[in-house]
């Protein structure tokens, strides 16, 4: 097993413009401190700084043909520090800034810059970090970058992290991109964003391919010097807007050794407490080891460490979801809140118990699809989706219902679709985590007959853009006994976002006919249960999602929920039940399909209405066979369970985010007497990993049952079979 396939605990110690101060430090003590106090085993060391005014062209080490960073003229940081890092078991990766360069340096290479569609340099119109520009992966700059990579590897380091390059929005229209696109597609670059233009979609793919090819050639250059070296860049997370900067882990992972993405804390951002967990689970869906990047900082106040419980919670969520943590510490680190202790507590635990994080396999039988195809190419056919609806808030006797005007701008329409998908993923994720449902995230490439054999239930949260082969694999999965839960426009478009006329697919979902979209409106529209279903009694009113299709179900389809007739305004009397079903349940072969004409997941993701989450989770539970694990605990307790087959044991991770209702979190409220039931006929021993205390258990009807007396923030329970 390669070192990077084992649990890795990464750190970057950031000195900003004062990086030269390290030449006066005791380098051995520096390495020892990071290993023994912070418990890392991998360090990012700055080789080409990412500091103002864009000094990525300078190096902190001897590199033939490259300018030295001031203060390093007679000091080779990498060659000096590397022996001490290795002495203390720290793998050394070099940080190379590859996206931010000063205007002065760019003037020496005017044909390297990324150009926007107006033929102006991107950095001129959008100065990077207020001052600086960026270069194109198809320009001769790539050869300059590959030389820097080779010079870096000659120092003997273990690998490289590339901070960039980034293919920025509306880029690139330089001569090299023009020539390459013309050679590849036989046409000139499209002039503007136009999702009805096939060339625009080709341009989107061209940008991603260009970045992937740069990484491929960067990896090749690195391995010419050290065949065992590792290389990776920030390949982007789950967010649907990733196409705007050509990020796609499925494209990049063939040429890198980690799939990494940022999940920084910002005090004003309205992020879920499970944001880091979500990023970790998404990244582990790839084929490569995952790493989640966290600043150990109070948002943009970089020299003040993040509140202790926030950083501990983030690190626990990362390792519990089988990803690797990375923290950036900014020097000098203020001591007014806490220094190394919160980080050392979690990373020290992971270091001490590394064997329990090795070679684990998921026990999840539910798969949730996060579709890069959809996030990139989805543009709904329904124009009423693009009306300004306002927020639905009523304050001071004024109701915000928007202007009702139709958005016609392509860029704005695309943003609306991205927002819907963004909230769909969040809504689906939160619903399942908060209901203690075990699930995996799967990517587009996983929608194959072979991969789907691992699961009982497949959830497609508006996976609108699916290829013919993907649709066939899904139908085969259900025909052989699998269960499907799909919503809204799932499968209505091909993998490039082109509208399909696939009547068989709609019949597969239980649809006889789609009439139109209900008038979108925030508030005062409802669904009702026409039978007892999913915990809702008959005639129960349920909030209707804003985006809802009006469909007719095919014969023999069960329809337990119906929409009420739409109301054009609030404070109006209900008009009775419509003829349009709100949920379609049908059989297909040996399996079952549940289809929601509404964007249920997006509705919960944006509005957090509990009845919607209840509907989502109860449908998934209804489709599942007997649950592998059941837990009686507050919804803010996350559970992840894995099996170590070689050691014949289950690993149960419990993360408690029950806090004081604001972020940054100041207090975690302990949860007591958590009842857990695990589907297992027999077991030898159950114990807490932190103190090895045994936990009493009982056998009952093919399951074992036990109680966790108290959960503070993070606990690992071992079940030996």
Each language-model region and where it sits:
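Boundary/entry segment of secreted carbohydrate-active catalytic domains
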Residues: 1-26
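Glycine-rich, aromatic-flanked loop segments that form ligand/cofactor-binding clefts
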Residues: 10, 38-48, 76-127, 159-164, ...
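Aromatic- and glycine-enriched glycan-recognition loops and surfaces
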Residues: 17-38, 62-90, 143-144, 210-214, ...
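Short, acidic/polar
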Residues: 19-36, 139-152, 241-252, 276, ...
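Active-site-adjacent "subsite" loops/lids of carbohydrate-active enzymes
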Residues: 20-21, 94, 98-155, 172, ...
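Catalytic domains of carbohydrate-active enzymes, especially glycoside hydrolases
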Residues: 25-54, 155, 254, 258, ...
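Aromatic- and acidic-residue-enriched segments that line the glycan-binding/catalytic groove
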Residues: 55-71, 98-128, 163-194, 243-250, ...
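Carbohydrate-binding surfaces of carbohydrate-active enzymes
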Residues: 200-201, 205-243, 252-721
């Amino acid at each position: 097993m390669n070192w990077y396939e084992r649990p890795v605990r990464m750190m970057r110690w950031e000195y900003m413009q004062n990086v030269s101060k390290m030449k006066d430090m005791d380098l051995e003590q520096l390495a020892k401190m990071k290993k023994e106090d912070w418990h890392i085993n991998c360090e990012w060391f700055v080789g080409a700084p990412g500091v103002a005014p864009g000094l990525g062209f300078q190096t902190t080490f001897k590199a033939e043909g490259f300018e030295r960073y001031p203060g390093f003229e007679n000091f080779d940081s990498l060659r000096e520090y590397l022996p001490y890092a290795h002495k203390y078991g720290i793998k050394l990766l070099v940080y190379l800034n590859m996206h931010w360069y000063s205007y002065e340096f760019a003037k020496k290479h005017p044909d390297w810059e990324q150009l926007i569609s107006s033929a102006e340099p991107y950095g001129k119109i959008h100065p990077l970090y207020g001052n600086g520009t960026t270069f194109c992966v198809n320009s001769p700059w790539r050869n300059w970058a590959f030389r820097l990579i080779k010079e870096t590897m000659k120092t003997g380091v273990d690998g490289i992290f590339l901070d960039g390059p980034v293919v920025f929005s509306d880029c690139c229209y330089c001569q090299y991109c023009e020539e390459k696109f013309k050679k590849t597609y036989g046409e000139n670059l499209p002039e503007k964003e136009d999702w009805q233009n096939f060339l625009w979609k080709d341009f989107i793919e061209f940008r991603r391919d260009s970045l992937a090819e740069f990484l491929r050639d960067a990896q090749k250059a690195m391995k010419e010097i050290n065949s065992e070296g590792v290389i990776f860049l920030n390949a982007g997370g789950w967010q649907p807007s990733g196409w705007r900067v050509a990020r796609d882990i499925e494209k990049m992972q063939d040429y890198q050794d980690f799939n990494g993405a940022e999940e920084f804390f910002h005090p004003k951002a309205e992020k879920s407490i499970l944001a880091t967990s979500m990023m970790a689970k998404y990244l582990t869906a790839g084929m490569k080891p995952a790493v989640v990047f966290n600043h150990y900082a109070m948002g943009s106040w970089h020299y003040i460490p993040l509140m202790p419980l926030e950083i501990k919670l983030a690190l626990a969520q990362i390792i519990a979801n089988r990803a690797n943590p990375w923290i950036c510490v900014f020097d000098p680190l203020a001591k007014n809140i806490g220094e190394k202790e919160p980080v050392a507590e979690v990373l020290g635990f992971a270091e001490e118990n590394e064997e329990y994080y090795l070679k684990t396999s998921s026990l999840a039988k539910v798969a949730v699809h996060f579709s890069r195809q959809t996030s990139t190419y989805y543009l709904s056919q329904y124009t009423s989706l693009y009306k300004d609806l306002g927020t639905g808030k009523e304050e001071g006797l004024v109701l915000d219902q928007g202007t009702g005007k139709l958005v016609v701008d392509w860029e704005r329409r695309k943003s609306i679709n991205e927002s819907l998908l963004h909230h769909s993923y969040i809504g689906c994720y939160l619903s399942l985590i908060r209901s203690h449902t075990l699930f995996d995230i799967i990517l587009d490439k996983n929608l194959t007959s072979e991969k789907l054999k691992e699961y009982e239930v497949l959830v497609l949260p508006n996976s609108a853009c699916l290829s013919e082969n993907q649709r066939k694999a899904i139908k085969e999965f259900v025909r052989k006994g699998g269960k499907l839960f799909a919503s809204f426009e799932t499968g209505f478009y091909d993998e490039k976002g082109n509208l399909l006329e696939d009547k068989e697919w709609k019949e597969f979902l239980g649809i006889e006919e789609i009439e139109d979209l209900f008038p979108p409106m925030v508030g005062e529209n409802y669904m009702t249960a026409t039978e007892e279903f999913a915990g809702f009694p008959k005639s129960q009113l349920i909030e209707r999602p804003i985006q809802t299709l009006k469909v007719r179900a095919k014969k023999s389809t069960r329809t337990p929920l119906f929409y009420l007739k739409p109301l054009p305004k609030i404070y109006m009397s209900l008009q009775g039940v419509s003829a349009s079903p709100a949920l379609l349940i049908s059989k297909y072969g040996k399996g079952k399909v549940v289809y929601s004409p509404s964007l249920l997941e997006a509705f919960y993701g944006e509005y957090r209405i509990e009845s919607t989450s209840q509907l989502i989770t109860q449908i998934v539970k209804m489709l599942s066979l007997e649950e592998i694990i059941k837990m009686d605990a507050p919804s803010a307790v996350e559970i992840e369970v894995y099996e170590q087959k070689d050691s014949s044991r289950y690993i149960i991770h419990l993360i408690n985010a029950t806090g004081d209702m604001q972020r940054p979190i100041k207090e975690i409220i302990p949860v007591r007497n958590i009842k857990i039931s695990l589907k297992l006929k027999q077991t030898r021993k159950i114990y807490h990993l932190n103190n090895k205390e045994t936990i009493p258990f009982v056998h009952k009807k093919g399951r074992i049952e036990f109680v966790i007396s108290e959960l503070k923030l993070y606990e690992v329970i071992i079940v030996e079979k």
